[in-house]
């Protein structure tokens, strides 16, 4: 269901649209699927989505005055509740034509996610995931945000375990 929401928003991304408009379109789509936006009013958060543009890291509040422009990159963090279960996923998109450097950032970031997923197998340790992400990203010279981490999800939006995207010295729990 969340992928349907992401696809709807991806199709709407264009120069001239505001992040507020994307938020309202996404909320309408979530509700049309019989779901509830799980970010809206979460710890006082005033929107259904976190929509960050360019160098904003995450959790930016949609705004009528924040207009997307050709060459921007926009990250949409979306979540919904369906039959008491939460989902949460972020996607980053190009707004029109972007620079090769911006495209490389999107590509490396996306692939780092899949490198981590490859390590999420029985017998490995939790932080094998973290280290795989760091191993992939570091040679490209990109920094990794250490204040935010991946997390479990289910009956609550944020559940254990926490999964850092940066290198860990310890192994973590066995999967």
Sequence positions of predicted segments:
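Active-site neighborhoods and metal-handling regions in enzymes and metal-associated proteins
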Residues: 1-175
């Amino acid at each position: 269901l969340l992928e349907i929401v992401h696809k709807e928003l991806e199709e709407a991304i264009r120069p001239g649209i505001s992040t507020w408009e994307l938020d309202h379109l996404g909320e309408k789509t979530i509700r049309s699927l019989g779901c509830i936006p799980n970010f809206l009013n979460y710890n006082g958060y005033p929107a259904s989505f976190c929509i960050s543009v360019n160098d904003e890291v995450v959790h930016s509040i949609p705004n009528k005055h924040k207009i997307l422009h050709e060459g921007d990159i926009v990250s949409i963090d979306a979540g919904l509740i369906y039959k008491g279960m939460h989902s949460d996923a972020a996607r980053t998109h190009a707004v029109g034509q972007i620079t090769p450097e911006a495209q490389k950032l999107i590509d490396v970031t996306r692939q780092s996610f899949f490198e981590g997923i490859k390590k999420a197998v029985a017998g490995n340790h939790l932080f094998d995931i973290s280290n795989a992400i760091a191993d992939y990203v570091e040679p490209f010279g990109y920094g990794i945000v250490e204040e935010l981490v991946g997390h479990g999800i289910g009956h609550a939006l944020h559940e254990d375990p926490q999964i850092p995207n940066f290198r860990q010295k310890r192994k973590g729990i066995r999967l």
